[in-house]
């Protein structure tokens, strides 16, 4: 284990995505000496001042070649092949915080996995997870969690929902903004836009990661990540239009007919996707840094 006699050391795997810079800055504010490990394909001025290790975080050989026998007080794994990273760094770090995703929950992509159809509302960390009879991606996400705790039993694992904000490579709200910029007077959405979904503003998601770093006693378990308020589609549309000074009618249609809304909704079947954040608040001490209603307009 690390025995550094000066500042604590922190390794951030990733560091240049939607939540990376805020995580790096938060660790520095906690007096950690931060190193970023990523491929080097997407550099960012916000984290250019810290040590960078460039390599392949997706393979065992790549992680070993990049990190060798280096040790760290804290590892925050936001990128790469998590099951490989967890195994290679076993015994080389004091604390391990990792980021996964809500597809670990059974039915997150396909709510027909439940009878009657629909995810549990709210979905807590103990909800059924995806199995081999679910879609392959969801099962692999859940299986990776198992492999993580095999190698890092005291890890804190965070289940990200869809993250929005700066540097998001697939900004769903662009589907709304583009129509506003085009001067459209209406937008088609399923079921009058009443579906509610927990998402996470990038600054808020990074704050959960930092709360996890601050709470080592919570090791060995998973936590949901998200804004404290789960907005409906119609609310997101209204907030964006208000910010841009545009009026646009929400035209509700049955889900089967609202095909133009598929890229915005990112799901075929209707249903709420609301995460239970009770443990995140009560155990990790999380509270929104930016409210969902404010963040949507940023």
Language-model regions: role of each:
Residues 8-30:
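N-terminal Rossmann NAD(P)H-binding glycine-rich loop of SDR-like oxidoreductase domains
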Residues 144-167:
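Conserved beta-loop-beta element that borders a ligand/cofactor-binding pocket
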Residues 171-176, 189-213, 220-221, 297:
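Substrate-positioning beta->alpha
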Residues 51-77, 86:
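Conserved Rossmann-fold cofactor-binding substructure of NAD(P)-dependent oxidoreductases
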Residues 291-298:
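Amphipathic terminal alpha-helices
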Residues 101-139, 143, 149-150:
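Active-site "gating" loop of Rossmann-like NAD(P)-dependent oxidoreductase/epimerase domains
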Residues 211-272, 277:
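Mid/C-terminal beta-alpha module of Rossmann-like enzyme folds, strongest
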Residues 13, 165, 189-195, 223-230, ...:
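Glycine-rich Rossmann NAD(P)(H)-binding loop
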